[in-house]
UniProtKB/Swiss-Prot annotation:
It is an enzyme of class 5 (isomerase). Responsible for synthesis of pseudouridine from uracil-55 in the psi GC loop of transfer RNAs. InterPro entries: PsdUridine_synth_cat_dom_sf, PsdUridine_synth_N, tRNA_psdUridine_synth_TruB, tRNA_sdUridine_synth_fam1_C, TruB_C. Its EC number is 5.4.99.25. It comes from Psychrobacter arcticus (strain DSM 17307 / VKM B-2377 / 273-4). HAMAP family: TruB_bact. This is tRNA pseudouridine synthase B.
Length: 380
């Protein structure tokens, strides 16, 4: 069970007279505002003489021109915002063909123009298929990425173009539909780090022309959807108590299903940062979850590392080996297997920590050997 944001409100240690507001709110970002401006506005709206969130942050930037879903974390929820930074995102955009801008969207200056060849939805379907899957994308100059401690858009505004290494992205779903002879509607679900502005330019090139975005709306972030949002105007029109009803629990951003229930004594110990031995509390389901998480981690991070392991030189294959040597080799392999198994049992996996009342108290890292390390805990 998750702790509700209104239940999580506690006295701030720095301001004992103020109740700390914690939770996640899904805002429909208006056009023309930066993401940080929206965060500052929301933080202000949850502040009163008796209330304060202390901290606030979003889970992924939207350009000023863009609208749509912007999850904002307040108070204790900011500790878990990074889980949504890594989540897949869905967008709907409008591409205007025939011209390119320096920013890749309608906020920039037109830098080049081109004629538009005839196209239809059949052609667009074929082009969309070309963009599906894993690929690399070069970030735009007008972005907040940094090079040598300086943001790329600062170089761009100074008329300087710098090399940007391509980044791995995945387009998991994409649809292109003709709006008219000059405009295309793009709907895409993509991995983190994908720039829809760059994708729009690449699609225009595939059609045989140039293009830039004239509209962009984020529809989904992880499991959060646009129809669950509230506009800033509507939020501002509410009283503080009504605003709090739109807050999701502090752990709403966390996409971890496994949980471990701790006794009151164990809760006190983890709140003090102490490690626990919970080997007797690891159910079969929890052990299976940890094992699966370890296997998934190893397959993604070490998929190329294992290729060259245990490869012998051709000359070594021709060496004379007696029975004793063979037995020694088998003994060595057994030792290696034992060591590898021991290491696997020590790999920590993040899980939810729950108290005896079913209240979420934070995250811990637990391994198959039963060691639990407190990781991110909320201040109760």
């Amino acid at each position: 069970m998750s702790i509700a944001s209104t239940q999580a409100d506690k006295k701030s240690s720095n301001h004992p007279d103020k109740i700390k507001i914690s939770g996640v709110i899904l805002v429909d970002k208006p056009q023309g505002m930066t993401s940080q401006q929206v965060v500052s506005k929301v933080k202000y709206l949850f502040k009163s003489p008796n209330h304060d969130s202390k901290k606030a942050g979003h889970t992924g930037t939207l350009d000023p021109m863009a609208t749509g879903l912007l999850p904002i974390c307040l108070g204790e929820a900011t500790k878990f915002s990074h889980y949504q930074l890594d989540a897949d995102k869905s967008y709907q955009a409008t591409i205007l063909l025939g011209s390119q801008t320096d920013t890749g969207d309608a906020d920039g200056q037109v830098t080049a123009e081109a004629t538009i060849s005839a196209f239809d939805d059949t052609m667009l379907d074929k082009i969309a298929q070309q963009f599906l899957g894993a690929q690399q994308q070069i970030p735009p100059m007008y972005s907040a990425l940094k090079k040598d401690g300086k943001k790329l858009y600062e170089y761009a505004r100074a008329g300087i173009e710098v090399d940007r290494p391509p980044r791995d992205i995945i387009l998991k779903a994409i649809e292109l539909k003709a709006i008219d002879e000059q405009q295309i509607q793009l709907t895409v679900t993509c991995s983190k780090g994908t720039y829809v502005r760059v994708l729009a330019e690449d699609i225009a090139k595939a059609i045989g022309t140039l293009g830039h975005l004239t509209a962009l709306s984020r529809l989904q972030v992880g499991d959060f959807k646009i129809d669950e949002t509230i506009t800033l105007a509507n939020l501002e029109a509410l009283a503080l108590e009504q605003r709090q009803t739109y807050l999701l629990p502090v752990d709403a951003c966390i996409d971890i299903n496994a949980e471990l229930t701790l006794s009151s004594e164990q809760c006190e110990r983890v709140q003090m940062g102490q490690r626990l031995n919970v080997i007797d509390q690891l159910t079969n389901d929890l052990q299976s979850y940890i094992t699966s998480a370890i296997e998934q981690h190893l397959s993604t991070s070490n998929k190329n590392a294992a290729v060259n392991q245990n490869v012998e030189d051709d000359n070594d294959d021709n060496d004379d080996n007696d029975d004793n040597d063979d037995n020694d080799d088998n003994d060595d392999n057994d030792d290696n297997d034992d060591n590898a198994q021991q290491l696997l049992h020590e790999i920590p996996v993040d899980i939810r920590l729950i108290d005896e009342h079913g209240t979420f108290i934070g995250l811990g890292a637990v391994s198959l050997n039963g060691r639990l390390q407190p990781k991110k805990l909320i201040q109760l």
